Amino acid sequence: MLKLFVPGRLCLFGEHTDWAGHYRTMNADILPGMAIVTGIEQGIYAEVEKASNFEMHSDAAEMKDAWRDFSCRMTETDLKRVAKSGSFFCYCAGVASYMLEWYKVGGVRIRITNMTLPMKSGLSSSAAICVLVARAFNLLYNLNLNTMGEMNIAYLGEQRTSSRCGRLDQACAFGVKPNLMTFDGDEIEVQSLNVKKTLHWVFADLCTAKDTIRILSDLNKPYPFAQNEKEQNLHRALGEWNHKIIERAVKYMAEGQVEQLGQLMTETENMFEEYITPMSPALQAPKLHEVLRDPAIQPLVYGGKGVGSHGDGSVQFLARDAESQKKLVD
């Protein structure tokens, strides 16, 4: 039996540009997507072993209310049916079906022992579970896949469900460190970033609802070709304007300009609200905006923004120092 841990991921800058960059395969005028992402300390802990079927179990107290143990025969037909069902285990079954189809593996039994990652909060809980399943098959059946291979399989498995997340989510495969990711059509490049000073990030689950599938569906409609000015501005926001933001963020991190980095977060959120939020009713996020503008929080932070696909999922701040970070968390 093997013990595994897969972290969630926090997108610091560049949300939605992963799938937008993929449209370069159909429209060369679209710029590559660029995002700065990092794994976080919260994640999924599990024990895995070989089995005859594909099984998911959980002992995690955090999931006891939503969890029902799952078992499926290790056949392409059964696994693909679950993947398309929209059920709680559709993501896991999507990855398992891909592994069976391309690597002719047997089954696995995955027992989640601890879950410190909130669900549906923009921290890639679905991607983390996909990476966990891919890694379990990889290690148990000695497939010799590297981290990028696990990440790609997690993405392709998730594509077998009704979800249409981009490749950015699977950055959790790289562990707890900041990376610059570039998405050029079907190609992905990952570069580790230099961070000169300690950055005191704080992120929080807003404990409200968000509809990621609706958000992604609405934002994908103006691609690959924009038809009006609003759609052109969406292309710019996820393209050239995002490139400038990423360039500044990388510079501020490398030079230790923490205050400027926080201000850039707020600037980025304002751009998102002006040009991206109007493209989907599901992006209206009253709780997020209330928290970002809370006068009690402002003296403790340099800036803040939404997380992941946005909406009322989670919020992230760059605290001024360790003491301010602790006050925010408390």
Predicted regions and their residues:
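DPxDG-like acidic metal-binding loop motif
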Residues: G122-N146
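C-terminal nucleotide
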Residues: M1-A35, E41-C90, S97-E101, N152-S162, ...
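Active-site pocket scaffolds in enzymes
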Residues: D312
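Beta-strand segments within the central parallel beta-sheet cores of soluble alpha/beta enzyme folds
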Residues: V108-T113, L145-G157, Q263-L264
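Glycine- and acidic-rich phosphate- and metal-coordinating loops
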Residues: A96-S97, E101-S121
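Secondary-structure boundary elements
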Residues: M99-G106, L139-L145, E255
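Short glycine/threonine-rich catalytic loop with a Thr-x-Gly-x-Asp
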Residues: L123-S125, G304-V307
